[in-house]
A protein has these predicted regions:
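Cytoplasmic helix-loop-helix junction between adjacent transmembrane helices
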Residues: 85-124
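Juxtamembrane intracellular "pre-TM" segments in multi-pass secondary transporters
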Residues: 173-205, 229
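Structural signature of the two symmetry-related core transmembrane helices
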Residues: 57-71, 271-288
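Glycine-rich segments within core transmembrane alpha-helices of 12-TM secondary carriers
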Residues: 115-136, 248-252, 337-347
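Helix-breaking motifs and short loop linkers at transmembrane-helix boundaries and internal kinks
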Residues: 22, 54, 75-81, 231, ...
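Conserved MFS/SLC helix-loop-helix module at the cytosolic interface between two early adjacent transmembrane helices
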Residues: 41-79
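Helix-loop-helix hairpin linking two adjacent transmembrane segments in secondary transporters
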Residues: 120-173
Length: 392
């Protein structure tokens, strides 16, 4: 929850902040690009570290680090200082996902991991739901031009309380890997070569790049699209952003429940995940309609369905990654996250440049919703059948 609060504070106030700091749309895109690139390298670093260091200690450490950077963002004065803060935030925030996936892998069985991962991802949405309400509260009571600064600091302080609560409530030795699953894999020193030779890995490379591109671009640019592209007020855009992340939460939980339900009805675990992913990808494609709708209730309703789809694909993706490796789970998820972020982050810069040149968000928004379909195609072409997997 807290990692998305830190992340969404900026995008929710992006119109106000870019105006006050006199940033172009491309510069705002550069800030998101820098965040994503730092997140990529952080994913790689913490992905390797989580296989060596206890999650019980690593998790609160990275959260304290990104909370401190989030707090410092409330003091930025120009483009360069904002850029620096987002770089450090991206790097340390990346430690969340390798740690979280080790936790869900330890707690849930193979069949229940899609639902467990949906709970994990939905927590991020809860943070994103709360953030616009906090921001609106500050704007309601203060008309000061600097009213955008305290929300960064409040969210940063919340992270400190979470870290202490974690250390107090989680016993030492928690979240060790399941022995029976550890024995099923060889501890080959050539694990990286084996990974590169694995068709399933390359299917997931395409998938993570595609879903990260659509989710992150819409997340970062939605407030600007609503305010600058469709003429909504800042207040309405903030309230809708909360509603949007309610929809993403529903999509995320719904995806996990659907995959688990299909498994109980007799579908294979893999087929259940793939069907769920495909349905969510179809919802994401609704950007092709939303991008060309005028201001009005229909636009907002379609965007809610887009949100449900673009986040609903993630529990399926996380469950696929957990089938690649147990002994090297942190490293594998870290590598995939690195590739997903390093490839998708530059899109923000070019999207911003396009908006500067055309004064329109429409075409870019329409195209980005199609991206998750590429992940589905890659899975169908590259992921081996169940019988082949058993023989590997």
């Amino acid at each position: 929850m807290i990692n998305y609060m830190d992340r969404q504070v900026l995008s929710n106030m992006s119109v106000r902040i870019t105006s006050q700091l006199k940033l172009s749309e491309e510069q705002y895109g550069n800030v998101e690009w820098a965040f994503g690139t730092a997140f990529a390298f952080g994913s790689l670093a913490f992905g390797f570290l989580v296989d060596k260091v206890s999650v019980r200690w690593l998790y609160p450490a990275v959260l304290l680090a990104w909370s401190a950077v989030g707090f410092a963002t409330g003091f930025v004065r120009n483009y360069d200082s904002l850029l620096a803060c987002r770089i450090f935030l991206g790097f340390f925030e990346a430690g969340h996902w390798p740690c979280a996936l080790v936790v869900t892998h330890s707690v849930f069985s193979k069949e229940e991991r899609p639902f467990g991962n949906s709970i994990l991802q939905s927590g991020a949405s809860i943070g994103a739901i709360i953030t616009p309400i906090i921001i609106q509260g500050f704007f309601w009571y203060s008309q000061d031009d600097q009213a955008w600064r305290p929300p960064f600091q409040i969210v940063g302080i919340v992270g400190v309380f979470w870290a202490f609560a974690w250390c107090y409530s989680i016993p030492v030795g928690s979240f060790t890997r399941k022995k029976e699953e550890m024995k099923s894999e060889s501890n080959s020193p050539n694990w990286f070569i084996d990974l590169l030779m694995n068709r399933r890995f390359w299917a997931l490379v395409v998938m993570v790049i595609s879903i990260n591109t659509s989710w992150q671009l819409i997340r970062a640019w939605m407030p600007k699209f609503l305010q600058q592209g469709r003429g909504y007020s800042e207040s309405i855009a903030l309230y809708f952003n909360s509603a949007y992340f309610v929809a993403t939460d529903i999509g995320c939980i719904g995806a996990g429940l659907l995959a688990s339900r299909l498994t109980r009805l007799g579908r294979s675990v893999h087929a259940s995940r793939l069907i769920t992913y495909g349905l969510c990808s179809l919802l994401a494609c609704l950007t092709c309609i939303a991008a060309f709708l005028p201001q009005g209730w229909l636009l907002l309703v379609v965007l809610l369905f887009v949100g449900a789809g673009t986040l609903g694909v993630f529990p399926c993706y996380y469950s696929f990654t957990q089938e690649l490796s147990v002994t090297d789970l942190g490293k594998v998820t870290g590598i995939l996250s690195f590739l997903g972020w390093i490839a998708s982050s530059p899109v923000h810069r070019y999207f911003g440049r396009y908006v500067d040149q055309t004064k329109s968000f429409d075409l870019g928004l329409a195209l980005v919703g199609l991206a998750p379909m590429l992940g589905l195609i890659a899975m169908l072409l590259l992921w081996p059948s169940t019988s082949q997997c058993k023989n590997d």
